[in-house]
């Protein structure tokens, strides 16, 4: 897909992030297992009903990286753009996945997602994510009300 003329949004940021992942599989072989969960999007009623019967669940994050690193058993990324905020169901999913050992975050750009994944991949032993490698251009904070890292 040529993104040159596409309006920038959550989908374009996610496409750019996944393109980066595919391009860096030689450097980080575990990236071959990162994938998008197609829960969102506009669908007609018939398709939505079929997907619901197939197990689509509201709130499940956009991206799953089922590779253990540091003290975590896997990683979930919820992509957002602009002023969009995660839904109640999305926040609930992220908090519950954190409780069972996943690293979870909300990223507002492809760059933020790349930095988070790079830090995650490079964790050693039982290290935790700190956001220390994100640099000055990106802010890493745990949202007070949500209790989830926002990058």
Segments and roles (model prediction):
Residues 1-151:
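Catalytic phosphate/metal-binding cores of nucleic-acid and nucleotide-processing enzymes, i.e., regions
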């Amino acid at each position: 897909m040529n993104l040159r003329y596409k309006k920038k949004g959550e989908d374009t940021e996610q496409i750019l992030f996944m393109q980066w992942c595919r391009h860096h599989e030689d450097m980080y072989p575990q990236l071959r297992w990162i994938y998008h969960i197609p829960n969102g999007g506009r669908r007609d009623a018939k398709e939505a009903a079929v997907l619901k019967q197939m197990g689509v669940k509201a709130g499940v994050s956009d991206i799953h990286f089922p590779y253990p690193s540091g003290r975590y058993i896997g990683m979930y990324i919820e992509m957002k753009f602009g002023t969009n905020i995660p839904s109640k169901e999305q926040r609930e999913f992220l908090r519950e996945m954190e409780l069972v050992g996943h690293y979870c975050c909300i990223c507002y750009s492809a760059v933020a997602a790349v930095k988070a994944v790079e830090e995650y991949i490079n964790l050693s032993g039982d290290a935790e994510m700190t956001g220390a490698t994100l640099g000055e251009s990106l802010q890493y904070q745990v949202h007070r009300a949500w209790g989830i890292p926002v990058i």
